[in-house]
């Protein structure tokens, strides 16, 4: 007696239905979709988080190295901080930078006051993307752009 050619298809369909039912009643499905979380998607980040602070400090340092300005800039305020888990971490930082009275030869940027004279005072809105791979001890400024 030869088996029906539809038997393997029927068995496969039964397995698919059983798997779909099992997934539908699993505890993870019962919790519903997570709001605001997409694997590999952008998430809002706490500005005070250690990783954000490290990325911010690196971004400003690189900005100052690449700038042709005789004076250094530092953060006035962080407008927005986001992060993205990849094979490491991408940080997307929107930052308002202000021109300080410190020249590039001065080391401690944190204690540098901002220029208050109108002809020397400059503020920029900058967007930075910083890529960090902690286990490889690497950090890179992927891209940045600024507007006066």
Swiss-Prot record:
The modification Pyrrolidone carboxylic acid is found at residue 31. A motif (Secondary area of contact) lies at residues 84-88. Residues 1-30 form the signal peptide. Disulfide bonds join 102-112, 126-146. The record marks 40 as: Reactive site. GO terms for molecular function: cysteine-type endopeptidase inhibitor activity. One of its GO terms (cellular component) is cytoplasm. Keywords: Disulfide bond, Protease inhibitor, Pyrrolidone carboxylic acid, Secreted, Signal, Thiol protease inhibitor. It is found in: Secreted. Gene3D superfamilies: 3.10.450.10. PANTHER family: CYSTATIN. Belongs to the cystatin family. This is a thiol proteinase inhibitor. This is Cystatin-C. The lineage of its organism: Eukaryota, Metazoa, Chordata, Craniata, Vertebrata.
């Amino acid at each position: 007696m030869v088996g029906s050619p539809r038997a393997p298809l029927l068995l496969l369909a039964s397995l698919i239905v059983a798997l779909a039912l099992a997934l539908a009643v699993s505890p993870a499905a019962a919790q519903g979709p997570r709001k605001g979380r997409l694997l590999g998607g952008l998430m809002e980040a706490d500005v005070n988080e250690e990783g954000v602070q490290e990325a911010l400090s690196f971004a400003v340092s690189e900005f100052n190295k690449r700038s042709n300005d005789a004076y250094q800039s530092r953060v006035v305020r962080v407008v927005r901080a986001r992060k993205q888990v990849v094979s490491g971490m991408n940080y997307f930082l929107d930052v308002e930078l202000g021109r300080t009275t410190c020249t590039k030869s001065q080391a401690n940027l944190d204690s540098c006051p901002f220029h208050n004279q109108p002809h020397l005072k400059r503020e920029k809105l900058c967007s930075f993307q910083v890529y960090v791979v902690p286990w490889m001890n690497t950090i890179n400024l992927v891209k940045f752009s600024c507007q006066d």
